[in-house]
Amino acid sequence: MISQIDKAELLERFLHYVSFHTQSKPNAKHSPSSVGQMKLAMQLQKELIQLGLENVEVSKYAVVTAFLPANDPNLTKTIGLVAHLDTSPQCSGKNVRPEVIEEYRGGDIALGIGEEFISPVYYSFMQKLVGQTLIVTDGTTLLGADNKAGIAEIMTALSILQKENIPHCNIRVAFTPDEEIGLGIHYFPMEKFSCDWAYTIDGGEVGELEYENFNAATAKVRFFGRNIHTGYAKGKMLNALTLACEFQQVFPVDEVPEKTDGKAGFYHLEDFSGDIEQVELTYLIRDFDEQNFAQRKAFIKNQVEKFNAKKGLKKPIELEIQDSYQNMYDVVKNVPQSIELADRAMKAVGIKPNHKPIRGGTDGAFLASKGLACPNIFTGGYNFHSKHELVSLQGMENTVQVIIEMLKCKDL
């Protein structure tokens, strides 16, 4: 088990990291998309050097890489650890003011002095956290446990390995920018991250082990109208807003995020913006199955063609579809040791592994597309991307324990 001193160190690290404003910016054309990410990258570079890691570098894109050689000649594997610097653009990450609740007693938790609260009535998992130390928000921002809990856990595990001289394999570490907007990983220096397999430390509840994720794409549908003074609009105005609303009705009403779970895919209208003359709809397309994923993209294309044929518009609606990431399972299944090692590590520290698909994506999906198996490990956090985000300190301890156990590389 981790000592009390290390528990305090873990909490201190986490609280320090969330003080950095690293919210990524949607539609950014360069990485990092925010200055705070580079500031955190430089801080982590300094700490990694202090911990004795080698080849510690920060690229101009704010990708941090480092290496810790094995201290046992019998441990020849190289394992990678990955976490991301940025926080979600879906909720403010500026001026995060965490609140620490010692020995949560159950019931509602008031957040700050406003009207926000979190309740086991809405979040049943809170019943499992009674007696634990919880870190919550003040109700005005997200917390940043996604993914600064993962960063703190990796750094604390490295610190313990070094202080206690625990036998370990070769370790590569990477901290990446702009994971939340799918941008930073495209600047990832694979040549500096040569390893047998890796893990993103970017999951949620204790025990989660994830190695399947959505295939993902984004579709943008643009509508063009014609504006005329409303008093004289009859037979002349063409309202792009009305066209967009009509088009939205063609989608299956039950194939949306709020009505699907498990391995069910969906269409998600993420953004509706514009005016009478021009509107853009942004859809997220998600599915675990590659064939179903292709069919979903074809469905939107066909609906656009039908809509244009039906309306006979002078300027037809336009469609742009861009793939975001692929299901990592096709790569991970060929490296079963990556799953077996995580399984054994969890069981060794008394945690029951919970294999589940990721209804989202991680940097591991991109790394898998480059041939590197990269399952995802829990962080102990919940309610990511929201003011109700929280993390359990005991859950974070569990993650550190699992990381250390994995890096011992027993029976490999």
Swiss-Prot record:
GO terms for biological process: peptide catabolic process; proteolysis. InterPro entries: ArgE/DapE_CS, Bact_exopeptidase_dim_dom, Peptidase_M20, Peptidase_M20_dimer, Peptidase_M20B. It is found in: Cytoplasm. Coiled coil: none annotated. The active site is at 86, 179 (proton acceptor). Its EC number is 3.4.11.4. GO terms for cellular component: cytosol. Zn(2+) 2 binds at residues 146, 180, 385. GO terms for molecular function: metallopeptidase activity; tripeptide aminopeptidase activity; zinc ion binding. Keywords: Aminopeptidase, Cytoplasm, Hydrolase, Metal-binding, Metalloprotease, Protease, Zinc. Zn(2+) 1 binds at residues 84, 146, 202. Binds 2 Zn(2+) ions per subunit. CDD domains: M20_peptT. It comes from the Bacteria. Its cofactor is Zn(2+). It catalyses: Release of the N-terminal residue from a tripeptide. Cleaves the N-terminal amino acid of tripeptides. Belongs to the peptidase M20B family. This is Peptidase T. It comes from Haemophilus influenzae (strain 86-028NP). The lineage of its organism: Bacteria, Pseudomonadati, Pseudomonadota, Gammaproteobacteria, Pasteurellales.
